[in-house]
Regions:
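Juxtamembrane regions of bacterial inner-membrane/periplasmic proteins
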Residues: 1-239
Length: 239
């Protein structure tokens, strides 16, 4: 007797099987890549940040004052090296107390940068993994949306170390160093470092020099709108 012809599987089943196979291959590939990344990160990458943030302000622009004919002190000259930066403190406790003598970075400016650059700054531990993987996938699939993977902590690390190498290990080093920085310093100290080292266009670095350059004001004199404008410059520092 002749054997009856084998029934072909429905088209939907074949498609489902193909999709599941591709999914499993993708999961296995991601697992292998993630495992390799972790091995590389923990064995080959220097995740330390040598810079002491408490000493960082000593390397900034020095302002020289002279006494005029009326006996008042006025700015005579600013002395700086490669980077024109003036350090200003960020003290959230003084802001909350309503300290009238506080002349540091205003809350509106700090909040504007967090809102634009890193909404999860207060809750993450140096790295926003969702954004990081989104940026990684965007490198391969070129989505219409742009993914900024770096957190404020990671950007502070980049400004501190000046690590601009375009190699596979740079992002890994940045992530490891950001995690390390979060274990050593408070969020306020990290934010203060970031706001004082960020490039703001036209050779200015940090929010104090940027406030002087763009608005002719001290940083504590900025209005809410001016704070928002400064924060938006980070998206286009040649503004």
């Amino acid at each position: 007797k002749e054997e009856p012809p084998k029934k072909e599987k429905p088209k939907k089943q074949r498609i489902l099987k193909a999709v599941l196979t591709c999914f499993l291959i993708g999961v296995i590939t991601v697992a292998i890549v993630a495992g390799s990344f972790l091995v590389y990160a923990f064995t080959m990458v220097d995740g330390t940040v040598d810079q002491n943030l408490n000493d960082l302000k000593l390397n900034f622009t020095t302002t020289v004052y002279v006494e005029n004919d009326k006996g008042d002190w006025e700015e005579y000259q600013r002395l700086h090296g490669m980077y024109n930066r003036i350090w200003v403190d960020y003290d959230q406790q003084a802001i909350e107390r309503g300290d009238e003598d506080y002349k540091g970075i205003p809350a509106n400016l700090a909040n504007a940068f967090i809102a634009i650059e890193d909404k999860g700054f207060e809750t993450h531990y140096g790295v926003n993994w969702k954004r990081t993987f989104g940026a990684l996938l965007n490198e391969f699939f070129h989505f219409k949306d742009k993914f900024g993977g770096a957190t404020i902590t990671q950007q502070a690390v980049k400004n501190l170390t000046d690590d601009r190498k375009q190699d596979a290990g740079r992002k890994v080093r940045e992530i490891m160093r950001a995690r390390s920085l979060e274990t050593k310093y408070t969020k306020d100290v990290i934010l203060e470092c970031y706001l004082n080292t960020i490039p703001m266009g036209h050779g200015t670095y940090g929010v104090q020099v940027a406030a002087n350059y763009y608005f002719g004001k001290e940083v504590d004199e900025l209005t809410l709108v001016e704070c928002a404008c400064l924060a938006s410059i980070t998206k286009a520092p040649s503004f």
